[in-house]
Amino acid sequence: MGDIVFVSAALYLANSPNWKSKVLKPGFSPIPSNELYNFEQTLKSTSQEPVSSTAVSKAPEKSALDAEDGGLRLDYKGPKYQELRLFLPISLTQQLHTLVIQNIPESATKTADFIQWLEQATTKHFSTKTDGTKVEDLVENWSSVIASTLESTQDIFIRMYPLTEFAQVVLYWIEWFSKATDSVTTVHIDENTARYIDDIVPSSYTPDVTEEELVALRTQIADLKSSVSESSTENAAMVAYEVDMSTLSDLPKSSLNQLVKDIIEFRTRVLTMEREKRTQEALEEGRRRRSQLKRVMEQIRKSKGSSVPATEPEEDEDEYEDEDGEEDWAIERRRLEKEKESAQQSYNALLSHLNGTVMPDLRARKQRLILLKDYEAKLQRERAFFLKELLHLGNSDYYDHRREFKEEEEQQDDVDRRAQNEQRIQAPKDAVLQASASASRSPDTSAAHSAPVQEPVAKEQKIKLALKRVFDTRAQEAESDSEPEADIPATAVSASTPAPTADLPDRLPFQGPELAARMAELRQSRLVDELVNEYLGVYEDELVDYILDNIVENASRGQLLLELQETFDDDSVRIVDAIWAKLLKH
């Protein structure tokens, strides 16, 4: 707690000696001890009251304070000046009575004089008022900020007292500055202040600015511009530079003022030297560029074969400068023409986009909106056409899966496979028919005692779902077929269904490498693919892989027959016999 000091701003402003303490007291605020000096300076700047009738009696006290400070605080901006962070309005009244004068010439020493003159001139203009408006009662506080370092301009923020003539004064200033400077220097107010002025200004008031007042304002602004001299620049730099007093808190207060002045003078001297150095560098750069331009001009003259000597008089140089000006004007004309052409191209592109994309899309959206508004009526009106279209599409030939040209498509598929270098070895149909005729209709008794299928459940469910879709499709086709089929004699059915063979063994007599070789030959012959495609109606590669994996794992005819009965019913006997005949064939 040794670095903390408790202070009271109210007691300091009341000139009480007990305004600071090392212990906490009611109404005191803690601050670091190294910020105590800044706190005092801030309170000193804010404690300056406007000059009133008691200003004469307070003048000796002010002189004594200035003498005690040792000239540290340069009162060049007057008692009404505040730093920008202290100038910020803290109430609605202060906000409504705050305005800014923009683009005023920046002068570190004469800005306060300009504010004082502005008060006097305004009071003189409104001297006919009966309430006796005084100069001191017009401006409460003011502050400034640099607007442009290149143009040396500043913005002056002014907070006025809540006078009854506030609206008239603001409107008078706006008209005055606008006419005197051709709207270069303007008075700006925010939206809330503008509304407030509109509410309180008399309806019959019109700002009246005389020519004498315009000339006086122009003279004051010109005086601000001409005040930028070497001495004023150095003085402004000295005042603008602020010393961080927190780093000097350990020094005695008696030597602090002189040390601050020495620091500011040293800083000002360094800035002046740096400014002179930059000015000298700019001059040297200008000389170098001029010499370079002269060399370029000499090379141009030599390239054109001119006989004009290098040391030509000034009149000739002026002529060349005029010619260069004409060439520059031609370049500028070409640049303007290019910009105009580019703008025309952009306009044409936008116009084509409007006519080709935006407008057609807009018209289409309008038509669609009209149709959507009458959607229900349109459905009722065109219901017969929709039903006719549905009936036509429902009886289309593309829904008939039992087409007569199925064999032609299979032949075309074979041609396509051969064109794509896919070898397709088709087993002789007579061998398949012979194996099917010798197949036995009675299932083997050993099939009931065979081991359960070891395939994963997920794969079986996937195959069964695919087969279920096929069967559902077949059922729908059977229901949609409205033509009655002719009765087929039982003898024809029995003749077309070959009898199963009973001499085929239940288990394959070979295993290991020989079984792998027979399975590779069976897979290459694509017999299983053709059987599945023939009896199922569609080709299912997963079902083919499932049949081949079952043969490799179980090598049992009864087990395979049991697995295929659910899918192919009675056709499973023919499929299994054909596969077993192919495997047992030498």
Curated annotation (Swiss-Prot):
<feature type="coiled-coil region">
    <location>
        <begin position="274"/>
        <end position="356"/>
    </location>
</feature>
<feature type="compositionally biased region" description="Acidic residues">
    <location>
        <begin position="312"/>
        <end position="328"/>
    </location>
</feature>
<dbReference type="Pfam" id="PF24825">
    <property type="entry name" value="SNU71_RBD"/>
</dbReference>
<feature type="region of interest" description="Disordered">
    <location>
        <begin position="474"/>
        <end position="506"/>
    </location>
</feature>
<feature type="region of interest" description="Disordered">
    <location>
        <begin position="406"/>
        <end position="455"/>
    </location>
</feature>
<dbReference type="Pfam" id="PF24826">
    <property type="entry name" value="SNU71_N"/>
</dbReference>
<keyword id="KW-0175">Coiled coil</keyword>
<comment type="subunit">
    <text>Component of the U1 snRNP particle, a subcomplex of the spliceosome.</text>
</comment>
<dbReference type="GO" id="GO:0003723">
    <property type="term" value="F:RNA binding"/>
</dbReference>
<dbReference type="GO" id="GO:0071004">
    <property type="term" value="C:U2-type prespliceosome"/>
</dbReference>
<keyword id="KW-0694">RNA-binding</keyword>
<keyword id="KW-0539">Nucleus</keyword>
<comment type="function">
    <text>Component of the U1 snRNP particle, which recognizes and binds the 5'-splice site of pre-mRNA. Together with other non-snRNP factors, U1 snRNP forms the spliceosomal commitment complex, that targets pre-mRNA to the splicing pathway.</text>
</comment>
<comment type="similarity">
    <text>Belongs to the SNU71 family.</text>
</comment>
<dbReference type="GO" id="GO:0005737">
    <property type="term" value="C:cytoplasm"/>
</dbReference>
<protein>
    <recommendedName>
        <fullName>U1 small nuclear ribonucleoprotein component SNU71</fullName>
    </recommendedName>
</protein>
<feature type="region of interest" description="Disordered">
    <location>
        <begin position="276"/>
        <end position="328"/>
    </location>
</feature>
<keyword id="KW-0747">Spliceosome</keyword>
<feature type="compositionally biased region" description="Low complexity">
    <location>
        <begin position="489"/>
        <end position="502"/>
    </location>
</feature>
<keyword id="KW-0963">Cytoplasm</keyword>
<feature type="compositionally biased region" description="Basic and acidic residues">
    <location>
        <begin position="276"/>
        <end position="287"/>
    </location>
</feature>
<feature type="compositionally biased region" description="Polar residues">
    <location>
        <begin position="435"/>
        <end position="448"/>
    </location>
</feature>
<keyword id="KW-0687">Ribonucleoprotein</keyword>
<dbReference type="GO" id="GO:0000398">
    <property type="term" value="P:mRNA splicing, via spliceosome"/>
</dbReference>
<keyword id="KW-0507">mRNA processing</keyword>
<keyword id="KW-0508">mRNA splicing</keyword>
<dbReference type="InterPro" id="IPR002483">
    <property type="entry name" value="PWI_dom"/>
</dbReference>
<dbReference type="GO" id="GO:0005685">
    <property type="term" value="C:U1 snRNP"/>
</dbReference>
